[in-house]
């Protein structure tokens, strides 16, 4: 059986990266909330 997690650096960056977050309204909200919470890392 094929597992669900098939690591790929490119895919990881494209879906969860900083620029990907910056593009959408929801993503910007994510960044804002993580900044407010004081997360050490904003994105992957």
Curated annotation (Swiss-Prot):
Keywords: Ribonucleoprotein, Ribosomal protein. It comes from the Bacteria. PROSITE patterns: RIBOSOMAL_L34. The keyword Metal-binding does not apply. Residues 1-44 are annotated as: Disordered. One of its GO terms (biological process) is translation. Signal peptide: none annotated. This is Large ribosomal subunit protein bL34. It comes from Thermosipho melanesiensis (strain DSM 12029 / CIP 104789 / BI429). The gene is rpmH.
């Amino acid at each position: 059986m094929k597992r669900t997690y098939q690591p790929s650096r490119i895919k990881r960056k494209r879906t969860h990266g900083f620029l990907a977050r910056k593009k959408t309204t929801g993503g910007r909200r994510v960044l804002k909330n993580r900044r407010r919470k004081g997360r050490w890392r904003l994105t992957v």
